[in-house]
């Protein structure tokens, strides 16, 4: 199931990378970002405000040029003049900087470049050995491309809005499909970047878990059983040994002493209570002890007097 999920994620990354790059390239290269009314012919010194309003026609514009849709100049395109002479702005104002950024279109171009490198990283991840590192690079490229794209869109909207204080001079306009292609490219680029980073994190966690398990297998400590298990094995082995069933020296000493010795060495408190049975028992035990003590002595003397057991020294 996890391999299927990873295959789906790689498919989303590949298709999304191609879609984001294609949409942004089309958006930058086409002239349908904005629909508005404007004058298509070249301005002259004799033009006044009334004549210019009468000659305004529907136009569509992109990042660098404007094309006419109506009138005698239908289909004619001209370069956008971001710094007209009759515009009342100063070169050190924020509007001038906004126009400069809008004229350069640096952020859309940067977005296309980053998307291109991100697509190369996604393609290289299919053949490179350390594919998880390449996928991480692709994710970084796509996230950066999306941020550059949204900054360019914000700058474009701000440049078209003009001065908020001049509501009357504000013209009616609407955004075209090229603008929406750029917006969709931003969304897809961010999704692809997040999925690529997620693939890298998941792969990194798997590699880390695999290396950790291999380290535990190779370590000598992992080969030994746990302390409790070893303690139980030792206790069980000791209990199964025949020596463990023997009596202790203290218990042996107590059990080897005959009961007659105890009765022989104990003194009665009252001599009148001594009966004939106890005297007979003591005489019998005394005779047994004399026989027991004399037997080893006679056995040793017989062994010593036996000529076969004598040690001879060769001459």
From Swiss-Prot:
A Gene Ontology cellular-component term? dendrite
Superkingdom as given in the UniProt entry: Eukaryota
Q: Does the keyword Zinc apply?
A: no
What the entry lists under InterPro entries is as follows: CACNG_subunit, PMP22/EMP/MP20/Claudin, VDCC_gsu
The GO annotation for biological process reads: calcium ion transport; neurotransmitter receptor localization to postsynaptic specialization membrane; positive regulation of synaptic transmission, glutamatergic; postsynaptic neurotransmitter receptor diffusion trapping; protein localization; protein targeting; regulation of AMPA receptor activity; transmission of nerve impulse
Q: Is Cell wall biogenesis/degradation one of the keywords UniProt gives this record?
A: no
The record's subcellular locations are: Membrane
A molecular function annotated in GO for this UniProt entry is: channel regulator activity
Entry-annotated residues carrying Phosphoserine? 248
Chain ranges passing through the membrane: 8-28, 104-124, 135-155, 181-201
Membrane topology field: Multi-pass membrane protein
> Per UniProt, which keywords does this protein have?
Calcium, Calcium channel, Calcium transport, Ion channel, Ion transport, Membrane, Phosphoprotein, Transmembrane, Transmembrane helix, Transport, Voltage-gated channel
Record's function text? Regulates the trafficking to the somatodendritic compartment and gating properties of AMPA-selective glutamate receptors (AMPARs). Promotes their targeting to the cell membrane and synapses and modulates their gating properties by slowing their rates of activation, deactivation and desensitization. Does not show subunit-specific AMPA receptor regulation and regulates all AMPAR subunits. Thought to stabilize the calcium channel in an inactivated (closed) state.
What does the record note on quaternary structure? The L-type calcium channel is composed of five subunits: alpha-1, alpha-2/delta, beta and gamma. Acts as an auxiliary subunit for AMPA-selective glutamate receptors (AMPARs). Found in a complex with GRIA1, GRIA2, GRIA3, GRIA4, CNIH2, CNIH3, CACNG2, CACNG4, CACNG5, CACNG7 and CACNG8. Interacts with AP4M1 and GRIA1; associates GRIA1 with the adaptor protein complex 4 (AP-4) to target GRIA1 to the somatodendritic compartment of neurons.
| Record-stated family | Belongs to the PMP-22/EMP/MP20 family. CACNG subfamily.
- Under what name is this protein listed? Voltage-dependent calcium channel gamma-3 subunit
- UniProt organism field: Homo sapiens
């Amino acid at each position: 199931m996890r391999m299927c999920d990873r295959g789906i994620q790689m498919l989303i990354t590949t298709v999304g990378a191609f879609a984001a790059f294609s949409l942004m390239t089309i958006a930058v290269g086409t002239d349908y970002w904005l629909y508005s009314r404007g004058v298509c012919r070249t301005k002259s010194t004799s033009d006044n405000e009334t004549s210019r309003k009468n000659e305004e026609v529907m136009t569509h514009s992109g990042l660098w040029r404007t094309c006419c849709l109506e009138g005698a100049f239908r289909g004619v395109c001209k370069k956008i003049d971001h710094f007209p002479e009759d515009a009342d702005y100063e070169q050190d104002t924020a509007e001038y900087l906004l126009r400069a950024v809008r004229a350069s279109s640096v952020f859309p171009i940067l977005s296309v470049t980053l998307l291109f490198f991100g697509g190369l990283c996604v393609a290289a991840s299919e053949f490179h050995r350390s594919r998880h590192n390449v996928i991480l690079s692709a994710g970084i490229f796509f996230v950066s491309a999306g941020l550059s794209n949204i900054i360019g869109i914000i700058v474009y909207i701000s440049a078209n809005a003009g001065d908020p204080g001049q509501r009357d001079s504000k013209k009616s306009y609407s955004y075209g499909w090229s603008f929406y292609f750029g917006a969709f490219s931003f969304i897809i680029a961010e999704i692809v970047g997040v999925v690529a980073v997620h693939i890298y994190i998941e792969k990194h966690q798997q590699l880390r878990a695999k290396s950790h398990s291999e380290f535990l297998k190779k370590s000598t400590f992992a080969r030994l059983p746990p302390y409790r298990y070893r303690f139980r094995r030792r206790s069980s082995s000791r209990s199964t040994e025949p020596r463990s069933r023997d009596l202790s020296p203290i218990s042996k000493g107590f059990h080897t002493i005959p009961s007659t010795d105890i009765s022989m060495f104990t003194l009665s408190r009252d001599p009148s209570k001594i009966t004939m049975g106890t005297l007979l028992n003591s005489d019998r035990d005394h005779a047994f002890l004399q026989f027991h003590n004399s037997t080893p002595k006679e056995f040793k003397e017989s062994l010593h007097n036996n000529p076969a057991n004598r040690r001879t020294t060769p001459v």
